[in-house]
């Protein structure tokens, strides 16, 4: 499983990976920018992993996750891609850590999401 992160969520993901078992099956890539996408890196990730999970601190629709889906479609990669972005609905304002918790993006929530996807792609 490759986890691609866009934004400050990268720190939470790194912290989470330090505390979960089977981290050899998971690699985290902090994708520092969306435009332009690092196509060379994406090709190597898509060839190496059986599933991709994209975390972004933007709305799913039209964001980094959409760009990853478009890349996969254009390059004809056929592996599961799970998007974890902000739903296209009102999200209350507040401290980032509280919003992350509300979205299930705290250490516990991310760990569960990783485990679920790993179990589905065995």
Task: Tell where the protein language model's regions lie, with residue ranges.
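Thiamine diphosphate
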Residues: 1-122
């Amino acid at each position: 499983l490759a986890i691609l992160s866009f934004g400050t969520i990268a720190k939470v993901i790194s912290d989470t990976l330090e505390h979960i078992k089977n981290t050899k099956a998971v690699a985290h890539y902090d994708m520092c920018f969306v435009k332009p996408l690092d196509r060379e890196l994406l090709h190597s990730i898509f060839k190496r992993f059986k599933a991709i999970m994209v975390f972004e601190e933007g709305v799913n629709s039209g964001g980094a996750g959409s760009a990853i889906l478009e890349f996969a479609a254009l390059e004809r990669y056929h592996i599961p891609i799970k998007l974890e972005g902000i739903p296209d609905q009102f999200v209350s304002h507040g401290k980032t850590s509280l919003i992350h918790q509300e979205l299930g993006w705290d250490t516990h929530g991310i760990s569960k999401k990783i485990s679920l996807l790993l179990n589905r792609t065995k």
